[in-house]
């Protein structure tokens, strides 16, 4: 749209893509476990730098609007947190055939870990480990007497600097490219697998519900098994300004 100077045809294209009804339905479908993966192009036209934060904000909005999940007691949200966490981690890994290397914390996989302070979960990570090594973390003023002196700024650490990144990373390729060994990279090559057989039944975290989803573009209405999906605009969205003063 910027290239064409907000031409009327481009504006109409944007309006056809960003529809309140389908965005609201997407929110409900995520909470029901019908959509198993979230991405940078979800929730409208996408927010690539805010995927994690927006995903857990969506979970909070659904909790406020729809109440606890059947597996959650009134004072806990573990089932919902695990459902939305799977949309960001193991389910995308399964979908792309790379769950043998990443997606969950298991023996034999890369120790790619994000550590959070509970008060800032979903908004500001405390540490990011890449293959078990510190790659990104909050650091204070190097001129200070203690390491907690503010301002704390997220920045690269040992695994995120110099020649270290290729040594703690992998490049995902198809089997032929992996066997051919012709890619000029220091990164370990790993072939993707199982992508042709992935289905909704392969998804984890309660994200395997099936149903008939229909989109009526004329009426701008979305139904699941005949039931219209609705979600009112949120009056409050968490993980926003309060966490980024």
PLM feature spans:
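Terminal amphipathic helices with adjacent charged low-complexity linkers/tails
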Residues: 125-145
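Active-site neighborhoods of metal-dependent hydrolases
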Residues: 1-85, 96, 120
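Residues forming the flavin
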Residues: 88
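Beta-sheet entry/capping signal
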Residues: 35-37, 112-113, 126-127, 133-134, ...
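Acidic, glycine-enriched loop/beta-strand segments at the rims
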Residues: 82-85, 93-127
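Non-catalytic terminal accessory/regulatory regions of metabolic enzymes
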Residues: 120-123, 141-223, 227-245
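Conserved, mostly hydrophobic/aromatic
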Residues: 55, 108, 132, 220
């Amino acid at each position: 749209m910027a290239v064409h100077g907000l031409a009327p045809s481009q504006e109409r294209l944007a309006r056809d893509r960003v529809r309140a009804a389908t965005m609201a339905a997407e929110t409900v479908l995520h909470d029901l476990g019908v959509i198993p993966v979230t991405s940078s192009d979800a929730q409208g036209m996408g927010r690539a730098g805010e995927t994690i934060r927006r995903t857990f904000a969506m979970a909070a909005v659904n909790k406020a609007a729809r109440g606890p999940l059947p597996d959650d007691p009134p004072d806990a949200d573990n089932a919902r947190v695990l459902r939305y966490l799977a949309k960001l981690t193991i389910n995308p890994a399964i979908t792309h055939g790379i769950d043998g290397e990443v997606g969950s914390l298991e023996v034999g996989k890369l120790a790619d870990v994000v550590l959070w302070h509970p008060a800032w979960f979903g908004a500001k990570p405390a540490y990011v480990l890449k293959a078990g090594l510190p790659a990104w973390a909050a650091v204070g003023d190097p001129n200070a007497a203690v390491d907690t002196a503010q301002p704390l700024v997220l920045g690269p650490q040992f695994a995120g600097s110099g020649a270290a990144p290729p040594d703690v990373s992998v490049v995902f390729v198809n089997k032929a490219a992996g066997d051919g060994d012709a890619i000029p990279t220091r990164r370990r090559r790993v072939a993707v697998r199982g992508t042709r057989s992935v289905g909704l039944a392969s998804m984890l975290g309660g994200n395997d519900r099936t149903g008939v989803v229909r989109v009526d573009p004329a009426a701008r209405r979305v139904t699941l098994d005949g039931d219209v999906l609705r979600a009112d605009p949120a009056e409050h969205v968490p993980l926003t300004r309060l966490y980024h003063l």
